[in-house]
Amino acid sequence: MFAKTKKVISFISAAAIVLSITGCNKSDSSSNDESSRAETTRANITTAPVVETLGDFDLSDVVIENKAPADYKKTIEAEDGKLSGDAISTDKNFLGDFTGKGFISLFHDTDKIDLDIEIPEDGSYDVNLVSAADQAGSSCQISIDGAALVTSKINSTELSDNVAEKVLLTKGKHTITLNPKDDMKGIYIDSITFTTAKAVDLEQYKVSNELSNPNATEETQRLYNFLTNVYGKYTISGQYASNSEGKDSREFVQLKKELGATPAILGLDLIEASPSRIANGSSESSGQIIAAQAMDWWNNEGGIVTMCWHWNAPEPYLNANGHAWWEGFNQEATSFSLAKALNGEDKEGYDYLIRDIDAIAEVLIQLDDNHVPILWRPLHEGGGDPQWNNPWFWWGASGADAYKELWKLMYDRLTNYHHINNLIWVWNGQNPQYYPGDEYVDILGYDIYANEHDSSSQKDKYDYTQATTETNKIVALSENGVLFDPDIAFNDGARWAWFCTWNGEFTLKDMQLSDEYTTLDMWKKVYSSERVLTLEELPDLKNYPLDTEKFLAENK
């Protein structure tokens, strides 16, 4: 599991605004025909006429100048470094040929090698570890002068090249520290070589502006076109709000107060709209409250809304293994088997799936009728941490095939049955085996809860997510506990489309902006970066062009 476990806050503010439901009838949740059409009366709400504009928004490509010498190369043998912990040097060749006098074995995250190097110029360098691991896919943490720099994935059980590309280094003398990212996963380091890096390939950020749903609303198409336009040029700031308070949550208030800037993306969780939570005492207005917050953010503030759903398992399957009902989204807290519900072994379980999706559809229909596009991120973290193969939510616990079937079921139910057309589908399965296919996904997401003060770009996770499909798709840091340094990310190519910091302890401490996970200096750097978009810097998204190339050609 991630280094830090997020806390899901289950509390509805008594002061929250309740949105009245406008002309939306429940569909028959007992229906098993996902291709049929829902019998609903939809609200016909008009909006102001669109006058397309980009304003003075800059969409120039971002090319980072590299001042490193073109032919620079420096190799340091691992055994020449200072060893600590239980790190040991060996000259046995059971891992293949090595250079120098031997290589270093590291087994615990406290085992370290310190190496001294002098960098000739500020610039971008490739860092090649000739290394091996007991388990292919293990990682080596590379730090510089005590600060986390980058994670290098070791892909072989024999000594071979494992390159961390485009690492940003400053001129001067430095101490490079190497240690296993994960405890009890042995890694072996033969040498480390620094060479000048090539420029970032900008072609990877060219993404089609066609959504998976051909009937997507105009507002949704405009937002998605904006996202494709800024991908690789900016990272959009985001923050999850606690206590269903939306923009009035303490996170948003404190960020504005201390940083003078507001996150562009408001993160909301439909957890309390789960029918089993309402059956156990959550407010029946929970979904309406969330809808009101989303509408206010889009319509009145001009911001972007993302939604996840900590889907509480249906009532008969709760309180498993001594866990409370409100823990029902965790796989160990419920007896619900997704596989059995989908294969017909648990017919009642399947009907509950349809009931719950239909309940959430009521919230999404309100937003669709009110022209509010949503970055919709259901069934998040389905594969858990792929390194450990440990799905922690029930929707991933039955394996990849069941997860993909549920994703397609939900996509069909919301899109083709309920005709909800305001959703940009963000897949956050964490494991390529859980990927349902390009036709069901618009954006790829990954959730990262890094160690405290690890402001590295998490490029290994970015590359891992990007490689899920051969189709160029936007890659987003859909949840995070620690903010990454945008200078590092834009230099090494891990240009996450957005970040969305989780609420509570990852943002606040004693009702103030917290430095427990992200340092206060990094908070300030991120929210003042020219590469990070805040709410105040967003263009007019309601009037953003549907086709930017055509708009620019017609408005020279």
Regions found by a protein language model. Give the residues of each.
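N-terminal module-boundary/linker segments of secreted carbohydrate-active enzymes
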Residues: 56-67, 195-271, 276, 280-284, ...
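Substrate-binding cleft of secreted/luminal carbohydrate-active enzymes
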Residues: 473-556
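Aromatic-lined carbohydrate-recognition surfaces of secreted/lumenal glycan-active proteins
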Residues: 377-379, 407-432, 473-482
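Substrate-binding cleft of extracellular glycoside hydrolase catalytic domains
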Residues: 275-409, 420
